[in-house]
Amino acid sequence: MSIDESTAAKVAKLARIKVEDDALPALANEFNAILGFIEQLEEVDVEGVDPMVSVTPMALPRREDVVTDGDQQTRVLTNAPDAREGFFSVPKVVE
């Protein structure tokens, strides 16, 4: 698969990254280099290799699954810069 300048421009737009027209060829080349590396990774034989999520084997400690109300609301809200009616109060961020 090869990325041309128009596809690179589309990817930049979708990622909300402003890219000048004169930088599009370099961006397309970077994308092609990344895709080439991914194609190399696809050639690696991983048959029989267990998937890893960590470089060190870990087992999480188990505990009884007990439903509680937590009883921590007042302690948690004391750390809040602004709490109202038992909830965190934050500035509006979406119009």
From Swiss-Prot:
InterPro entries in the cross-refs: Asp/Glu-ADT_sf_sub_c, GatC
GO molecular function, one term: asparaginyl-tRNA synthase (glutamine-hydrolyzing) activity
ATP-binding among keywords: yes
Top-rank EC class of the record's enzyme: ligase
GO terms of biological process kind: glutaminyl-tRNAGln biosynthesis via transamidation; regulation of translational fidelity; translation
Source organism, top-level taxon: Bacteria
Keywords: ATP-binding, Ligase, Nucleotide-binding, Protein biosynthesis
Record keyword Nucleotide-binding present: yes
Physiological role: Allows the formation of correctly charged Asn-tRNA(Asn) or Gln-tRNA(Gln) through the transamidation of misacylated Asp-tRNA(Asn) or Glu-tRNA(Gln) in organisms which lack either or both of asparaginyl-tRNA or glutaminyl-tRNA synthetases. The reaction takes place in the presence of glutamine and ATP through an activated phospho-Asp-tRNA(Asn) or phospho-Glu-tRNA(Gln).
NCBIfam families per the UniProt record, alphabetical: gatC
Subunit-structure text: Heterotrimer of A, B and C subunits.
Record family assignment: Belongs to the GatC family.
PANTHER family given in the database record: GLUTAMYL-TRNA(GLN) AMIDOTRANSFERASE SUBUNIT C, MITOCHONDRIAL (PTHR15004:SF0)
Protein name as annotated: Aspartyl/glutamyl-tRNA(Asn/Gln) amidotransferase subunit C
Native species: Jannaschia sp. (strain CCS1)
